[in-house]
């Protein structure tokens, strides 16, 4: 049984996530009162139940029921009903832009400005974020990107189906990766930006990869980095983590971080892990 609870900030993509899960065969129920979660779980976990994948949507409109939600989650754990919680996050500026584009009002902004409603909701939702097994930052995602992310996380068939590892390159000058569990700064590695014939290329190009890795420092760093990742991943699996985000950052996110991200993703894939690779800023200037 796959039992997924979807929550997060209003405007961060919960509806898109629920639609993506529904397309993948999940039985989806949106805005279920938290007090009914336990009854619903009992029905789903009955031996004769034909439901094997469930997604429940919980949002701020049910904020008065948060106490009931915590009671329900405690009950699920007590009864050994396994569940995952996906939390959708997004930065305030993008949330505000999304609300202006759709001309919809924030559910908490009836008597206040939208930015104030977003701030209040973020504070209310923080305890749920801390309980979540998977946090997805949709700041730089379009709906199709989010759908693809959900599809990769909840697809099956790999050797380690309980953990999805996202390896993401980024540029520090464009902002740090907000949802990363691990962040590695590779700005000390040889920089192809200062080589004229390599500047317009990215870490996906062999010439850039060779330039970055053709130094003793790069080789030694990568061996030690990989050794640490190989040590950490089983610990996260043992802890029950569902989604691990590894961020690799350089200055612009085009050369060094892309190179190291590609190497990490390739190595982890070869070891049978489910890996999602993404280059957040490689096309930015």
Curated annotation (Swiss-Prot):
Keywords: ATP-binding, GTP-binding, Nucleotide-binding
Residues noted as binding GTP in the record, renumbered to the chain: 59-62
Domain of life: Bacteria
GO-annotated molecular function: ATP binding; GTP binding
Residues where ATP binds: 8-15
Gene3D superfamilies named in the record: P-loop containing nucleotide triphosphate hydrolases (3.40.50.300)
Entry-linked Pfam families: PapZ_C, RapZ-like_N
Keyword Transport in record: no
Record-linked InterPro entries: P-loop_NTPase (IPR027417), RapZ-like (IPR005337), RapZ-like_N (IPR053930), RapZ_C (IPR053931)
Family: Belongs to the RapZ-like family.
Function statement: Displays ATPase and GTPase activities.
Protein name: Nucleotide-binding protein CD630_34000
Organism expressing this protein natively: Clostridioides difficile (strain 630)
Phylogenetic classification of the source organism: Bacteria, Bacillati, Bacillota, Clostridia, Peptostreptococcales
């Amino acid at each position: 049984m796959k039992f997924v609870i979807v929550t997060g900030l209003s405007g961060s993509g919960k509806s898109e996530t629920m639609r993506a899960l529904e397309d993948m065969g999940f039985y989806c129920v949106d805005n279920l009162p938290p007090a009914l979660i336990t009854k619903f779980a009992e029905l789903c976990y009955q031996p004769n139940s034909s439901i094997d994948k469930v997604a429940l949507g919980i949002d701020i409109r049910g904020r008065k029921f948060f106490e009931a939600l915590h009671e329900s989650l405690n009950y699920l754990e007590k009864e050994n009903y396994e569940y995952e919680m996906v939390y959708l996050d997004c930065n305030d500026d993008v949330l505000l832009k999304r609300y202006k584009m759709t001309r919809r009002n924030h559910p908490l902004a009836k008597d206040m400005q939208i930015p104030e409603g977003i701030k209040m909701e973020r504070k209310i939702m923080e305890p749920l974020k801390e309980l979540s097994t998977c946090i997805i930052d949709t700041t730089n995602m379009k709906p199709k990107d989010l759908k693809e992310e959900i599809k990769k996380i909840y697809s099956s068939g790999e050797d380690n189906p309980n953990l999805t590892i996202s390896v993401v390159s980024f540029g520090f000058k464009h902002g740090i990766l907000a949802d990363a569990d691990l962040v590695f700064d590779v700005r000390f590695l040889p920089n192809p930006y200062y080589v004229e014939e390599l500047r317009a290329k990215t870490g996906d190009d062999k010439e850039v990869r060779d330039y970055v890795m053709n130094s003793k420092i790069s080789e030694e760093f990568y061996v030690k980095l990989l050794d640490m990742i190989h040590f950490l991943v089983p610990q996260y699996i043992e802890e029950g983590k569902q989604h691990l985000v590894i961020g690799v950052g350089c200055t612009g996110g085009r050369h060094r971080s892309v190179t190291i991200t590609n190497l990490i993703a390739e190595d982890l894939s070869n070891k049978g892990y489910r890996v999602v690779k993404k280059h957040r800023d490689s096309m930015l200037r």
